């Protein structure tokens, strides 16, 4: 279980995250929602330890993540895989090598320098690509792919880390509606098929209500809602987004996963 206790991050006098506390049981798909600047990205980056908390603790299976250093910290970052809005692929390298980068924490430094990837890791990376219909582009340069394809490669890279939890920071922010659906379906598949906990920052409330089984709403660095999507009221939506509720709750329909079933494979390779 992931437990966040009184987590705070200050930049000067401003609190990007202010006294956040919650727990996430294994296997949940949790959407972190709110306006830009609400503290969503900082929260996920603190959980991964890419940003340092000013106060509070992060516990995972009883281990104090905020106290980790050196090798133990690197191991935690492998167990809590990040997926970024910008994809963070190496464009000049082929797709398979980009996915194999997710295995670096398990390799001796000399192997990574000469790219001497073990066959079991290569097989794992190909299997991850095939999960998302990307096996056919394994030899292509990453920068030759569309945005939706690149994000699926980034998700495959996270999957080969064999993480306990995936932290997805606005993974669909730069994608069109079709690729938004494909990427969100990929995250849903990881969650339901592999049982990996997912925390996903989303600006769109409609998407969050469609895909997530729990929502954590943030405003000005503080958690103002924590519950099931059906429990989110119009008043809370106004507080989260500082908008008229009908501008946030259903003005445009989100892409729908088919019947909340696991997304089918074999239909997304060209996206």
From Swiss-Prot:
SMART domains: AAA (SM00382). One of its GO terms (cellular component) is plasma membrane. It catalyses: phosphonate(out) + ATP + H2O = phosphonate(in) + ADP + phosphate + H(+). ATP binds at residues 34-41. Pfam families: ABC_tran. InterPro entries: AAA+_ATPase, ABC_transporter-like_ATP-bd, ABC_transporter-like_CS, ABC_transpr_PhnC, MetN_ABC_transporter-like, P-loop_NTPase. It is an enzyme of class 7 (translocase). Keywords: ATP-binding, Cell inner membrane, Cell membrane, Membrane, Nucleotide-binding, Phosphonate transport, Translocase, Transport. The complex is composed of two ATP-binding proteins (PhnC), two transmembrane proteins (PhnE) and a solute-binding protein (PhnD). Belongs to the ABC transporter superfamily. Phosphonates importer (TC 3.A.1.9.1) family. Part of the ABC transporter complex PhnCDE involved in phosphonates import. Responsible for energy coupling to the transport system. This is Phosphonates import ATP-binding protein PhnC 2. It comes from Rhodopseudomonas palustris (strain BisB18).
């Amino acid at each position: 279980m992931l437990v966040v206790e009184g987590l705070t991050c200050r930049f000067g006098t401003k609190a990007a995250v202010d006294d956040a506390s919650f727990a996430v049981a294994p296997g949940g798909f949790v959407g972190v929602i709110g306006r830009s600047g609400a503290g969503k990205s900082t929260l996920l980056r603190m959980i991964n330890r890419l940003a340092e908390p000013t106060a509070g603790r992060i516990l995972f299976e009883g281990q104090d993540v905020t106290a980790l250093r050196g090798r133990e910290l690197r191991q935690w970052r492998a167990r809590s895989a990040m997926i970024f809005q910008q994809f963070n692929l190496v464009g000049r390298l082929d797709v398979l090598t980009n996915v194999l980068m997710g295995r670096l924490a398990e390799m001796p430094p000399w192997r990574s320098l000469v790219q001497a990837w073990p066959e079991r890791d290569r097989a794992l990376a190909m299997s991850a690509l095939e999960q998302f219909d990307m096996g056919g582009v394994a030899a292509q340069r990453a920068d030759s792919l569309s945005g939706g394809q690149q994000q699926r490669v980034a998700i495959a890279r996270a999957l080969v880390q064999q993480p306990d939890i995936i932290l997805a920071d606005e993974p669909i922010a730069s994608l069109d509606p079709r690729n938004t659906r494909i990427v969100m379906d990929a995250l849903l598949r990881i969650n339901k098929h592999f049982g990996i906990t997912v925390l996903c920052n989303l600006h769109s409330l409609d998407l969050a209500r469609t895909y997530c089984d729990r929502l954590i709403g943030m405003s000005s660095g503080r958690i103002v809602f924590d519950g099931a999507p059906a429990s989110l009221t119009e008043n809370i939506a106004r507080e989260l987004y500082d908008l008229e509720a009908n501008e946030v709750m259903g003005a445009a329909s989100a892409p729908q996963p088919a019947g909340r079933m696991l997304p089918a494979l074999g239909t997304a390779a060209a996206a």
